[in-house]
Amino acid sequence: MALFRHLTKNMLVECQRSGRFDEHLAGFYSLAYGNPYIYKDTYLAYYDQHSRILYLSLFELNGSENKIQCILTATKLFKPQKLIITTPEELPLNLAGFGCAKTEYDRDYQIHIPSFDETLRGGTFKQLRYRVHNAEKRGYTLEINRRMTPGHFHIIAQHEQSRKLDLYDSQLYLGIWEYLRKFKSPLLFNAFLEGSLIGFDLVDFFKDTMTIPLGFYTDAPSLADFVLYKEILYAKENNYIWLDLGWACSSGVEEFKRKWTAMPRFHIWAYEYEKQTSGLGIGSAESTNILQSSGPN
């Protein structure tokens, strides 16, 4: 049995449906990070042959497999120059001839929709109630569709200009349009003021979870609160159990998510490994028994 199988579009969709966390965005990641594969039907991998970066998600789809063995097998097969790994547990800082250049710990925050009081009554929601009402008084409106416009690209460009982005962030941003074009499930939640786009979220849906992988906003007051409140209402109306807001990322973003009653459901360690010029080699790959192509869709 092949250890790594190439994933077709239909297989990606199935991974998204059966996943619990990072697997939800397999289709999106496959457009941003490279050709998608699955290791023993459990761990997802994406290989970008241009940058020679291998992305591994060690969150489990089916059962459990040895994570270190997955990494060793992947490095032998793909021969990457760099590894980017997300995992629910800590990893060694040196692996198969790769040394860790960067590590981060984070938590994924989600709102439990059935227990959320959408009326925003009471002292707990006083600030949120004010911000939502402030946005409504200013005339913000929401439109849900799948259409990217020059306004979307302009807001993304402004976001990129104001930040020093990692390569994988830029790759995700560039993949939004194609994700909407190739897959049926994602939607755009667009906020407007007097007919002009002022911000938007990319939203997707899997089983009982509604997830927001990316959001882009101008500096319009109370904008993020307005959009999130509308998304909570949408999740309520469509009987979703969880609204996934993503990683905490920073103390300010984490505080925002906590105010909206989001709780950490998954612990994440993110590692960036670079190939070492000396030390233990990674060996040679006998790919005939490691990699299997699933053919065209």
Task: Give the ranges of each region predicted by the language model.
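Short catalytic/ligand-binding loop motif for oxyanion handling, primarily in non-cytosolic enzymes
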Residues: 54, 91-95, 152, 252-254
